[in-house]
């Protein structure tokens, strides 16, 4: 039995299914999570399917979470999507179910779950969920297609990132057969509030770039307050440094309320996820996240990026 058939058998076997994803969700986290819920309810309407986690205000237009009680987990199937390691799972009750499935596209360095399906060649978790539906000949609603397409758009940077493959385009084309306004969705994902535009201007004005193309910017709590922004909202400018032709790798250090820094690492071609692993993080070869606990560690991370280009 293939992995997809095994997952489908588990879905069929449970009356209650609860779906989790990672903290601080992006479109792929929400798209794969809620898209999977929509797919299951379309094919098995008698089942109770819920999604749990923090409601991210900046993505409220895409999807909302359900109210999930502790009792809901009794005898339930739990599926975690788009989450490489256990500490990043939003809502730690994921262990309270009867059976746990991991579905992901990140490097499998934390092999959790009673059943795990990881495809690092997939552009996104949403691509995997769509592939799962297609291979099992499952129905998709228009809403499911919209969510999954949004997830693919998000993690491929609208098909610009190297993770985009011919299979990605084939799967995306299948989703476009459904009735949703994909052009409006793309416009929504490509737009941002004026305060983000001002932050982007700040980034371009203050970005530090070394002679080999390693760049960095620090967004302190003072800067976030100045622009009236949350950490989650700064994700809108993560790709901005890469628009500069001389920039090859970059780090965005976002100071958190407790004083530590969330570090977003990106690269055009040089592998940077080993740097992330050394600093309480990880991720894809060209798109990773890390954590820094001092300005000195910020310097260390930037130096490591610079060393990659020497």
Swiss-Prot record:
Cited Pfam families: DHH, DHHA1
GO terms assigned for molecular function: 3'(2'),5'-bisphosphate nucleotidase activity; exonuclease activity; nucleic acid binding
Keywords (A to Z) from UniProt: Exonuclease, Hydrolase, Nuclease, Stress response
Cofactor: Mn(2+); Mg(2+)
Gene3D superfamilies referenced in this protein's UniProt entry, alphabetically: 3.10.310.30, inorganic pyrophosphatase (n-terminal core)
Catalytic reaction(s) noted: adenosine 3',5'-bisphosphate + H2O = AMP + phosphate
Source organism, top-level taxon: Bacteria
General remark: Part of the SMU_1296-SMU_1298 (rpmE2) operon.
Family: Belongs to the NrnA oligoribonuclease family.
Protein's recorded name: Probable bifunctional oligoribonuclease and PAP phosphatase NrnA
Organism: Streptococcus mutans serotype c (strain ATCC 700610 / UA159)
UniProt lineage: Bacteria, Bacillati, Bacillota, Bacilli, Lactobacillales
């Amino acid at each position: 039995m293939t992995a997809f058939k095994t997952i489908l058998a588990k879905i069929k076997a449970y009356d209650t299914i609860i779906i989790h994803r990672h903290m601080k969700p992006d479109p792929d986290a929400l798209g794969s999570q809620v898209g999977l819920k929509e797919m299951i309810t379309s094919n098995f309407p008698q089942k109770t399917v819920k999604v749990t986690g923090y409601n991210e205000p900046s993505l409220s237009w895409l999807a909302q979470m359900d109210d999930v009680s502790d009792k809901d987990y009794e005898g339930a199937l739990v599926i975690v999507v788009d989450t490489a390691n256990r500490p990043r799972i939003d809502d730690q009750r994921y262990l309270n179910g009867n059976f746990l499935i991991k579905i992901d596209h990140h490097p499998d360095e934390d092999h959790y779950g009673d059943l795990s399906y990881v495809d690092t060649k997939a552009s996104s978790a949403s691509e995997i969920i769509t592939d799962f539906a297609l291979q099992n000949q499952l129905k998709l609603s228009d809403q499911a297609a919209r969510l999954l397409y949004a997830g693919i758009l998000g993690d491929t940077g609208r098909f610009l990132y190297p993770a985009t493959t011919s299979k990605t385009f084939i799967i995306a084309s299948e989703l476009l057969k459904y009735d949703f306004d994909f052009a409006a969705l793309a416009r929504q994902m490509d737009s941002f509030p004026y305060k983000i535009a001002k932050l982007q201007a700040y980034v371009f004005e203050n970005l530090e770039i070394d002679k080999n193309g390693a760049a960095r910017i620090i967004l302190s709590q003072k800067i976030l307050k100045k622009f009236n922004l949350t950490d989650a909202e700064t994700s809108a400018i993560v790709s901005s440094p890469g628009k500069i032709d001389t920039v090859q790798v970059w780090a965005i250090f976002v100071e958190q309320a407790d004083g530590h820094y969330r570090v977003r690492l990106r690269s055009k071609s040089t592998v940077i996820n080993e740097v992330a692993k050394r600093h309480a993080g990880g991720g894809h070869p060209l798109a990773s996240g890390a954590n820094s606990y001092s300005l000195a560690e910020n310097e260390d991370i930037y130096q490591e990026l610079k060393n990659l280009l020497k």
